[in-house]
Amino acid sequence: MSGNSAANAAALAAFNGIGKKKKESTTKLNGTDNNTNHLGVIGSTSNQTKQHQQQQQQPQALRTPLPAHPSRKKSNKFSQLKRLNTAPAMASLQPALQIASPSISPTQPSAPASALDSDPDYFTLSPHTIPSKNEIAKSPQTPQDMIRNVRQSIELKAIPNNAQAKRLSVDYSPQEMLKNLRHSLHSRTKTSPMLTTSDKMGQTMLAEMRDRLENTRRIASNSVASLSLSPNLDFNKSTSDVSNLSHHYDVDTVSTDSFASFNSSINDRHLPHGISIDVTNHDSDEDEIDDREREEDHEPLDNGELKSTNNKVTVSSRLRRKPPPGEDFQMQLNDKSRDTISSGSYSLNPDEVYSFTDPDSYENLVSEVEVGETTRLFPQFPDANHYHQHSSKFRKKHQKVKPINGIYYRDMDSSNTSDTEESTSNLPSRSTTPLLGQPQQQVHFRSTMRKANTKKDKKSRFNELKPWKNHNDLNYLTDQEKKRYEGIWASNKGNYMSQVVIKLHGVNYETQKDPKEEAKMEHSRTAALLSAAAVEDSNYNGNNSLHNLDSVEINQLICGPVVKRIWKRSRLPSDTLEKIWNLIDFRRDGTLNKNEFLVGMWLVDQCLYGRKLPKKVDNVVWDSLGGIGVNVTVKKKK
């Protein structure tokens, strides 16, 4: 049974290796020819021919007798496998073992066919003498073997993290590699070809340009240094101490402690103007070179070879463009040093010292300050006027400042200050201290001892930022508004009035008729004049003189379309303009006189300010057209 089971397993593996698509055969195998043909398909063609010849030569020795009644057995899968495996044919067993061997043990290769052929006992064994299942070599594909194989494959494919292996050259360290690279670069630079002629020409051109720039710089510095500051000031270099690198004006120095220089010279000659300015340079390294160059340039001047100013101008004119004066020159003109203000010292002659207690000396100083323009007074910074003050507690502290001759002084006669504020205003302050040379302000006395009612004045003021606030000027036309509206009236009155065909109120057409003009007029226009009539107002109040209803010249009226075009420029809605027209139109003939036009313009401006239109124009507005517009109320005596 053990031999049959091993044969069945080998045959099943061979059958699966041929192809899984084939279905189970339904025909019975009744002869040995079918068995040999079926097994011959599995083997190779060359081995099949050789084995077939051997079967023909020795059929009796290799074959075993078949059972007597093979047809009685059932044709199932296992019976077919038994029949195939029991065949002792040499050609049928060899390919079956070769096909089944890789499926059983893929890691260990099967024995070659030559080794099987060389075995003398292999072909003599019968199917029943095949080794048992235990005798077959076991497959090494256990889980431990599989894990071991996977580990070996991973270790072989892994890249070792070794710095020595990654280096291109293990023999050299990084320092040696850098040294070799430098050596190669130096060797290449030494072996490089010589400079071409073009490179040499470029170097020579650069050298020439540098020389030209240096010469121009020296000439410019000499020309600036040679310029004199003023006809009365001598700018000379101090010979007391060269290391100080300071330029002095040779004057009698009577310097103060706050503006005195530490390195100023004392033994100098006197000049009448009595001003000494010490300009010190703190940049020692750069200024030493400049001073040496200036000493070399000034050596021929000291020896007597003096040049005129004309020659200096010609030297500077040779430049293409004269350089602008530097910061040093500008500061020297302003009597200030370049580095620090404290380095300059301002002094006065003892004869020119003024005392504020002596009136004669003070008057002389005032006259000189008024005449002289070089003296610069310190500017005064007045207090800013704060318009938006929402608290009444702090309003009294802010006093208005009035300018007098360009200098601001506090108003000593302001009615807004109280007695306590007058006592505090006498204290010294920065903005109230008068400058020297300005006339003292005259003292003004109050006209009355009563205090002004500031609250009432503030209420009556007109705030331009809030024009909609209620004040007295909103009830009538002011003089400024009246003049502005009269200019518009004068430039537009009488325009297109000759084209009006409606009979107008107050116009005497009999005195103005011209027979020549009537003859030239068309018949349609004459008929319109005869048939048309003005609309009469039944609610007429009798203001004939105000609205010129009785008598008026045609040139003193303005046409309705002209008024419409003027009012349209205000960009008010047409409904609002219609209401304004109805409020002022007393003539009812499509025209307006001067008073009506002025009131209409005033109402347009009031609408632009944001006020609402009244239901009726007050008499105060109409009265303001003829006079100042001030209503005086007389109180009765008690």
Swiss-Prot record:
Lineage: Eukaryota, Fungi, Dikarya, Ascomycota, Saccharomycotina
Organism of provenance: Candida albicans (strain SC5314 / ATCC MYA-2876)
Keywords from the UniProt entry: Lipid metabolism
Basic and acidic residues: bias regions: 291-305
Cross-referenced PROSITE patterns: EF_HAND_2 (PS50222), EH (PS50031)
Region (Disordered): 15-78, 270-356, 409-440
Stretches assigned to the EH domain: 539-628
Any one annotated GO CC term: cytoplasm
Gene expressing this chain: IRS4
A Gene Ontology BP annotation from the UniProt entry: filamentous growth
Compositional bias of kind Polar residues: 27-47, 306-317, 427-440
Gene Ontology molecular function terms on file: calcium ion binding
Entry similarity comment: Belongs to the IRS4 family.
Protein name, entry field: Increased rDNA silencing protein 4
Function noted in UniProt: Positive regulator of phosphatidylinositol 4,5-bisphosphate turnover and negatively regulates signaling through the cell integrity pathway. Involved in rDNA silencing.
